[in-house]
Regions:
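Transmembrane beta-barrel wall of Gram-negative outer-membrane proteins
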Residues: 167, 174-209, 214-252, 276-293, ...
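Short acidic/polar hinge/loop motifs at secondary-structure boundaries
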Residues: 107, 114-140
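Gram-negative outer-membrane beta-barrel transporters
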Residues: 343-345, 350, 413, 417, ...
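Conserved C-terminal beta-signal and adjacent last beta-strands/turns
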Residues: 187, 243, 469, 505, ...
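A beta-strand signature from Gram-negative outer-membrane beta-barrel systems
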Residues: 128-171
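Surface-exposed extracellular loop regions of Gram-negative outer-membrane beta-barrel proteins
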Residues: 248-262, 366-368, 373, 427-434, ...
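Face-selective signature of the C-terminal outer-membrane beta-barrel domain
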Residues: 237-245, 278-435, 458-460, 518-522, ...
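Membrane-embedded beta-barrel scaffold of Gram-negative outer-membrane proteins
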Residues: 194, 287-291, 297-315, 460, ...
Length: 705
């Protein structure tokens, strides 16, 4: 039995060529494709740490609300559900991104080739529509440097491509804490996609609501996703992309250790200040692909979007008294656009197969950032949770222009070289329109640039066993959010914050075992000028500083195995030792301390019986070691182990398919912390996870045959 999984753009311009050797190595065993080039390159033959989770696995017996549900099988990826839809998931890769108080940091993310990461490096998972995902592709290690402003890795989400026959599917899920999801999806195609005029389409929409596990954590989320492909002629294709999300979420905030132990569901400051957040995002893209000759291809992606955010925070009136204080309400409107174009040429050099990809990536974002007081005075007393007087008004511009070159060279039948370089240029320009007595003009600008090389040698010990060694230099600038606040309540942008640079070395092994794949990687990353949290006050406001030197080193193991026709086993183990190599604490010596927000050990195993129809069942076990909450390592979230079980039944009759399932998570009702807010100044580090919780769901689909 052959299992094919595809990893398309943007990985297509990471490893752009399909080598004859890679095609010859494919057998009837499991094959994972990691480029969109003709013929593809199997995951076995990719000289990098790449993991693929297909959409069916993401949706299998799952709520289909968050990426954290079914990505545990990816080693090196620490993804945690905050139980807080106002702050997004907490996601880090090999320790990069762990400092983020909201959104995703240190990782480049894409939806169908459109960046879900802004030019400054701030990303979001909130617009990912799990209902229509074909695959989630995760790249870790040195080659992530070739994507520019990201150090930890790359996540690419790919939408399903419609096929014949047309299909319509409706699904629903009901879970604990008043959680409900409805979804509707339609897909199809005319023709087989190879002739002029052939069209494929996928359209999906979802609605999710929840009261939330914690007090003051209710949320509503409405994502939508669409993809339309048109074959212009035998050599070219045009793809239209659309994506949107509308979120309204309360923010329960963090708890102290005592508050967590007393009542993990409480939200004392959420109720007092009515902390909440609304987000609206809409984006569209256009991708043109053309084969110029048998050896030359071009691809152009253009996109534009808008993201609006309004957040109410938990700050007292007195805290906002200083003229330089930006208030307790954040009001943002971001417009972003970009274009990525590349040309790929396949040829021979010294009679050896070689491929070159030359590209240029341009991204631009303008941000209107305003701050308001989070109260109105009623009879002289503050009424919190209301938008008050203006306290901040600025326009921030960010853009980058990055040329890049990549090559793959088959040196011998067994030895190949992959290498590339990117020149990353990033500009920030801030214009301050809120100039009043006590708050001067804080306008300013900054420019960051860096050469980012990466390379890898791969050697095929056998047709089923490859080893590789790789190196890359990463580059991570401060985001505009990290520049937005200075410590000790000082006004203006924190332009003293410098970008961090990292050097990563990795050795790895990939072995095909029957109808499965066993992968292993050892890595070390040394970083200069690491950007870390200086102080975090209240809900969603943090200031940052450079921490000198840090080191991340570890081991990743993963097994994806299928037995017979329906038995599946997945396992992943990550050991990550992330420490400061210089002192970063204001008092005391933190040299040698563990970096906060990062688990040293993570283990995931799942085993299940999943036939195409009939009864199915499975279970998973997740372990995460303790996580330090601050630089001083004086507080931490304890380690935990959770168990989940699921079962369901698939019934097919004619063109109809019905899938009904149920699941229980945290089977043994473990009390644990799901995530931490790093360096929270009031000790409110902890974001509790729910105890034992349940869910039932169903989907029904019809094929028009």
């Amino acid at each position: 039995m052959k299992i094919s999984r595809a990893v398309y753009a943007p990985f297509a311009f990471l490893l752009p060529v399909a080598l004859t050797h890679a095609q010859a190595a494919a057998t009837d065993e499991q094959t994972m494709i990691v480029t969109a080039a003709p013929g593809g390159i199997s995951e076995l033959d990719t000289p990098a740490s790449v993991s693929v989770v297909n959409g069916d696995d993401l949706r299998h017996a799952a709520p289909q609300v968050n990426l954290s549900e079914n990505l545990g099988s990816v080693p090196g990826l620490q993804i945690q559900n905050r139980q807080n839809f106002a702050q997004d998931l907490q996601l880090s890769m090999r320790g990069f991104g762990s400092r983020s108080t909201y959104g995703v940091r240190g990782i480049r993310m894409y939806v169908d080739g459109i960046p879900a990461t802004m030019p400054d490096g701030q990303g979001y998972t909130s617009n990912f529509d799990l209902n229509s995902i074909e695959s989630v592709d995760v790249l870790r290690g040195p080659f992530s440097a070739l994507y520019g402003n990201a150090s930890g890795g790359v996540i690419n989400v790919k939408t399903e491509t419609g096929e014949q026959p047309a299909k319509i599917e409706a699904g629903t899920w009901y879970g604990s804490y008043g959680s409900v999801r409805y979804g509707l999806k339609a897909s199809g195609a005319t023709g087989d996609g190879t002739q002029a005029g052939d069209v494929d389409y996928t359209v999906s929409t979802t609605r999710f609501t929840t009261h939330g596990y914690r007090d003051h954590s209710g949320a509503r989320k409405n994502p939508a996703n669409a993809k339309l492909g048109v074959r212009l002629d035998e050599a070219s294709k045009l793809t239209l992309l659309f994506n949107s999300v509308d979120i309204k979420a309360n923010d329960p905030g963090g708890l102290t250790r005592d508050e967590w132990r007393e009542n993990p569901r409480q939200s004392p400051r959420g109720d007092e200040f009515n902390t909440r957040k609304t987000t609206k995002q809409t984006q569209a893209g256009l991708r043109y692909e053309r084969a110029l000759t048998e050896n030359d291809d071009i691809s152009v992606m253009a996109y534009a979007g808008e993201r609006e955010t309004r957040q109410f925070q938990s700050f007292k009136q007195g805290f906002q008294a200083a003229p330089s204080n930006p208030g307790g309400v954040i009001d943002l409107t971001r417009h972003y656009q970009g274009i990525d174009s590349r040309w790929t040429h396949r040829d021979a050099l010294l009679s050896l197969p070689v491929s070159f990809t030359l590209g240029l990536d341009y991204e631009n974002m303008s941000e209107d950032r305003k701050g308001f007081e989070n109260y109105r005075l009623i009879n002289g007393a503050p009424q919190y949770g209301e938008k008050g007087n203006l306290r901040r008004n600025e326009r921030n511009l960010m853009w980058n222009v990055d040329p890049y070159l990549q090559t793959t060279w088959q040196l011998t039948d067994k030895l190949s070289l992959d290498a590339g370089v990117r020149y990353s240029n990033i500009w920030f320009d801030s214009n301050d329109f809120y100039v009043v007595p006590g708050n001067g003009d804080d306008s300013g600008e900054a420019n960051y640039h860096k050469w980012l090389p990466a390379g890898s040698l791969k050697y095929a010990l056998t047709d089923a066993w490859n080893v590789y060694a790789s190196y890359g230099r990463g580059f991570e600038t401060p985001t505009i959010n990290e520049l937005s606040y200075r410590s000790n309540g000082q006004s203006g942008l924190n332009f003293a914050l410098k970008p961090s640079t990292s050097d990563t070395v990795e050795i790895g092994s990939k072995t095909r075992i029957g109808n499965g794949l066993l992968t292993a990687a050892l890595f070390r990353t040394d970083t200069d000028n690491e950007i870390v949290v200086d102080e975090s006050v209240g809900s969603g406001r943090s200031s940052y500083k450079n921490a000198g030197k840090t080191r991340r080193q570890g081991v990743e193991l993963a097994l994806d195995q299928q037995f017979g026709d329906a038995w599946k086993l997945k396992a992943a183990w990550t050991y990550l030792d992330a420490t400061y190599r210089t002192n970063v604490c204001r008092t005391g010596d933190c040299n040698g301390n563990r970096m906060p927000g990062i688990a040293r050990n993570m283990l995931y195993t799942s085993f299940g019986y999943e036939p195409e129809t009939g009864w199915y069942a499975g279970g998973d076990v997740r372990y995460m070691s303790s996580i330090m909450a601050n630089d001083a390592n004086t507080d931490k979230a304890p380690s935990y182990t959770t168990v989940g079980l699921n079962t369901g039944y698939k019934f097919q009759r004619g063109n109809w398919l019905l899938d009904v399932f149920g699941r229980v998570d945290n089977l043994f009702d473990k009390s644990y912390v799901g995530s931490v807010i790093v360096n929270e100044s009031n000790g409110r580090y902890y974001e509790p996870a729910p105890g034992r919780n349940y869910g039932v769901g169903a989907s029904v689909s019809y094929r028009f045959e």
